[in-house]
């Protein structure tokens, strides 16, 4: 029986675990998930340097991992050990669990190597209570004139319950959405729906290039954030809900310039 391993790489090179590296080195084929998330410094070249020679390394897009699992299963059926390596944690904000199930149904062994995800890292760095986060959501690029209202509605639902919202930002091919673009999209949704979900004076927390030496985590108003230079992507946003006084003090003294 072959082994299918799902390997979380963490959010940057310094968070890649020995367990992750050992698992990759014990694989014949490594499939690098390049579409689910993006790191400030992990890419396919970094993976090549991390693992021993002789490995087949494949860069995978959404089509391979979500629509062409037969390719992966064929490798396993031919007794190749396969690892799927993802930025962050391999099962947070992914659909890869379906691959584990399919491999197990075919009689193969499966293994999961967790990694430090941007979700957990951001919550810690934001100084907000982990108990007060609601559903997370992705802000997507507009398609023609259509703007998906899902993030607006999720923020609304979370705020009604006093909960914070983490906003993941869209990736399209090689373009990553910036925090500035995401907030401008949300303001356009507010102008359209007018449910008082977001105003220019609201405080938001923005993370940029988390896990790298040049990371930024700042709290500022929506209006300020639309103009702020957060530097290179990836970016991520928290829309706070009701703040406990300790959370408010932490934002004021630790995150606001």
Swiss-Prot record:
Gene designation per UniProt: dphB
Identification of the protein by name: Diphthine synthase
Record-level Gene Ontology MF annotations: diphthine synthase activity
InterPro entries registered for this protein in UniProt: 4pyrrol_Mease, 4pyrrol_Methylase_sf, 4pyrrole_Mease_sub1, 4pyrrole_Mease_sub2, Dphthn_synthase
One Pfam match: TP_methylase
Membership in a protein family: Belongs to the diphthine synthase family.
EC numbers on record: 2.1.1.98
GO biological process: methylation; protein histidyl modification to diphthamide
Purpose of the protein: S-adenosyl-L-methionine-dependent methyltransferase that catalyzes the trimethylation of the amino group of the modified target histidine residue in translation elongation factor 2 (EF-2), to form an intermediate called diphthine. The three successive methylation reactions represent the second step of diphthamide biosynthesis.
Reaction equations catalysed: 2-[(3S)-amino-3-carboxypropyl]-L-histidyl-[translation elongation factor 2] + 3 S-adenosyl-L-methionine = diphthine-[translation elongation factor 2] + 3 S-adenosyl-L-homocysteine + 3 H(+)
UniProt feature coiled coil, ranges: none
Organism annotation: Saccharolobus islandicus (strain L.S.2.15 / Lassen #1)
Source species, domain of life: Archaea
Subunit and interaction comment: Homodimer.
